Regions:
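Mg2+/Mn2+-dependent nuclease catalytic core
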Residues: 56-76, 85
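Basic, glycine-rich
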Residues: 6, 21, 31, 100-105, ...
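Conserved catalytic cores of phosphodiester-cleaving nucleases, focusing on short active-site segments
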Residues: 37-59, 75
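Structural motif
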Residues: 34, 47-49, 92, 102
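Domain-level recognition of nuclease-like catalytic cores that cleave nucleotide substrates
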Residues: 85-109
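Active-site metal-binding core of divalent-cation-utilizing nuclease and nuclease-like domains
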Residues: 20, 24-47
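Acidic-basic catalytic patches of nuclease active cores, encompassing PD-(D/E)XK
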Residues: 1-28
Length: 109
């Protein structure tokens, strides 16, 4: 499966999970020229910025290892822009990394 399709699948799974738990998904793939935030969701008075990492194998490393500090900093700066542009600076903010390791599913049955 292509990396882009794998990533899209993980993001869709994440959005479905969030919606089932009464989150409002505000954005998917919000970006500027320096960074991208996979999912931005709102629940109550908290805005959640979510990086989704999906893997089909461990060849490229585990999904949880794929968000270096430099990327975290770019996401944080883009989140600040998003909050200001959308008049959400009064909201609480949380950052999350959702990891989906699809290769584990192969061995579930």
């Amino acid at each position: 499966m292509e990396n882009k399709k794998i990533g899209s699948l993980g993001e869709e799974m994440t959005c479905s999970y969030l919606k089932d738990r009464k989150f409002v998904v505000l954005e998917q793939n919000y970006r500027n020229r320096y960074a991208e935030i996979d999912v931005i969701a709102l629940k109550g008075d908290t805005v959640h910025f979510i990086e989704v990492k999906t893997r089909c194998s461990e060849v490229a490393g585990r999904a949880s290892e794929a968000v270096p500090v430099s990327k975290q900093n770019r996401i944080r700066r883009l989140a600040e822009i998003y909050l200001a542009d959308n008049d959400l600076c009064d909201k609480h903010v949380e950052f999350h990394v959702v990891t989906i390791d699809l290769h584990d599913i192969n061995y579930a049955f």
